[in-house]
Regions:
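A cross-family phosphate/adenosyl-ligand binding-site feature
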Residues: 1-113, 117-186
């Protein structure tokens, strides 16, 4: 079964690349138009990311297999997830492949992880996150698990270290055993 990875138009798309590289499952990739634009601005050619995926669909392709709940998946991660996408999912709007696939994951009770990058949150964002969590989704703000750097000189910790630790937490929510956890680093 494939892991569905979607990216929307928030910054922080380096984490998307790391997730796809580290995922032990084949990846089905979907990007919003703005997600593609941000990726190209921050990381370079989007085609390089597409080459790492087993399948790639346009966000406008509502006939893609993942638009149906009958197609099994490992789960879905929206990384990064804009608060606009969060709001659409929270209120039942499935007008794109990303939001439709998210709704399929909720209704089929499959893992749906929304990695919200934007801060601070308004009351509307908090309520939307609550709605998605109540429906079975996992809200995981793009905040690295700093505790995984315990005992290290902060000057020696790189952005890549923090992003890798974050991705390991995401993958652990999908059933992948983490290389390190709090018990091994403390």
């Amino acid at each position: 079964m494939n892991l569905v990875v979607a990216l929307t138009g928030a910054t922080g798309v380096h984490v998307t690349r790391i997730l796809i590289e580290k995922a032990p499952w084949p990846v089905t990739l979907v990007a919003s138009e703005q997600g593609r634009a941000v990726y190209e601005q921050e990381c370079g050619a989007f085609a390089a990311l597409e080459a790492r995926a087993a399948e790639v669909y346009a966000d406008s392709d509502l006939k893609a297999p993942i638009a149906s709940g009958s197609v099994p998946t490992r789960g879905m991660v929206i990384l990064p997830c804009t608060v606009n996408t969060l709001g659409k999912i929270a209120h039942g709007i499935g007008d794109t492949l990303i939001t439709r696939a998210a709704h399929c994951h909720l209704k089929e009770q499959r893992k749906l992880i929304l990695c919200i990058r934007e801060t601070p949150w308004s009351l509307i964002n908090l309520q939307s996150a609550g709605n998605v969590a109540a429906a079975g989704g996992i809200i995981m703000p793009l905040s690295p698990p700093f505790y995984m750097m315990a005992g290290r000189d902060p000057a020696s910790v790189t952005m890549e270290d923090l992003l890798n630790a974050y991705v390991d937490r995401v993958l652990s929510l999908l059933g992948q055993e983490p290389v390190e956890n709090w018990g091994t680093v403390r």
